[in-house]
């Protein structure tokens, strides 16, 4: 079968609960991908994009804070820097309050050359209170 028109995609998820302290990167234990623009290793939290283009990034999950009431928040980072607008925040009133953080954004990965490597490494970072995340899901789709 000719896959010339097949999009590069990644669907990464973690169904089981994972404890995430403040500033921890969320990890995804399972994945399914197509194409060759996106690289990911199960059990990690880093997605590497090696081909230039526009990419749609979406995250969702279920979270419960783990002891201290406050804001449960996650932030998409590209090469260690926050991606503006790619943040989800919800207030958890107590240790049993369930929140559903989610965000969606589009990023651009510029063309690389011999002297400039524009590879993008994406992570989802817990920037709120320590929390337990379950059913975390990250999708990356190369639009063009």
Task: Cite the ranges covered by each PLM segment.
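Extracellular jelly-roll beta-sandwich "head" domains, especially the C-terminal globular C1q domain
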Residues: 1-144
């Amino acid at each position: 079968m000719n896959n010339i028109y097949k999009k590069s995609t990644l669907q990464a998820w973690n169904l089981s609960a994972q404890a995430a302290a403040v500033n921890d990167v969320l990890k995804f234990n399972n994945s399914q991908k197509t194409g060759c623009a996106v690289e990911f290793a199960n059990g990690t939290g880093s997605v590497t994009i090696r081909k230039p283009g526009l990419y749609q990034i979406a995250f969702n999950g279920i979270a419960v804070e783990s002891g201290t009431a406050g804001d449960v928040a996650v932030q998409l980072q590209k090469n260690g820097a926050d991606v503006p607008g790619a943040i989800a925040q919800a207030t958890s009133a107590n240790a049993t309050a369930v929140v559903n953080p989610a965000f969606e954004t589009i990023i651009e990965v510029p063309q690389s050359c011999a002297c400039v490597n524009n590879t993008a490494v994406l992570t989802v970072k817990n920037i709120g209170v320590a929390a337990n995340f379950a059913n975390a899901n990250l999708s990356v789709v190369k639009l063009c």
